């Protein structure tokens, strides 16, 4: 068993070479793990600027109940916004919270900038007593354009949506049953089956880049690249491969 009754650091200082600027903060928390269950708390609060990271997590063997509450928040001009090159360096908040039995756990995710939602949705994990595989379902969407350089906003438009569903087994086999990613100029659909060891058994990926009304600038590094329409399909099936 592991037990950390109380962590209470009144002054934590990091120099500029570590994260790009000097940081002063307090750090508190606790940890208890015994017989496969436990709980953990962590709170990091800056004292020189308005920013914090807090985490509360727990799991109980008797009820198989899992709890998770993660919050990351920083005021305008914070480290994360600056490191990511977000225009205007807005205030950012990322929250991930959920509670439920281990065989049907769901969490909600929310990302906001300057108080406006940018990405939100649900992540669900499902297990079955007669299978060692864990299924996952992800459904996220939002307006990411304000977080991007102005020249790329037409590509993403006002809504970007990600949906994915699949499973991961105890034998390290990974199945991606469905993948869907859509924005104003992008549509991606795909699926894959990955064998233990990371070897693909099959995959299929269809990508369409097209913007109504004309050419669109691709959000890639290097020289500016505009396309009117691009369609790419990648497919592989081990059972049909000559190799």
Where on the chain are the PLM-derived regions?
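Short, flexible domain-boundary/linker segments around small modular repeats
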Residues: 147, 156-165
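Membrane-embedded beta-strands that build the outer-membrane beta-barrel scaffold
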Residues: 40-42, 55, 68-70, 94-98, ...
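Elongated, acidic membrane-bridging lipid-handling scaffolds
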Residues: 1-102, 112-116, 123-131, 194-196, ...
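Residues that define the transmembrane beta-barrel architecture of outer-membrane proteins
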Residues: 23-25, 51, 90-92, 158-160, ...
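Outer-membrane beta-barrel translocator/channel fold
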Residues: 151, 217-221
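Repeated loop/turn-to-beta-strand initiation elements of outer-membrane beta-barrel proteins
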Residues: 36-41, 64-65, 103-107, 172-176, ...
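Short, intrinsically disordered, charge-balanced linker/junction segments flanking boundaries
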Residues: 1, 232-243
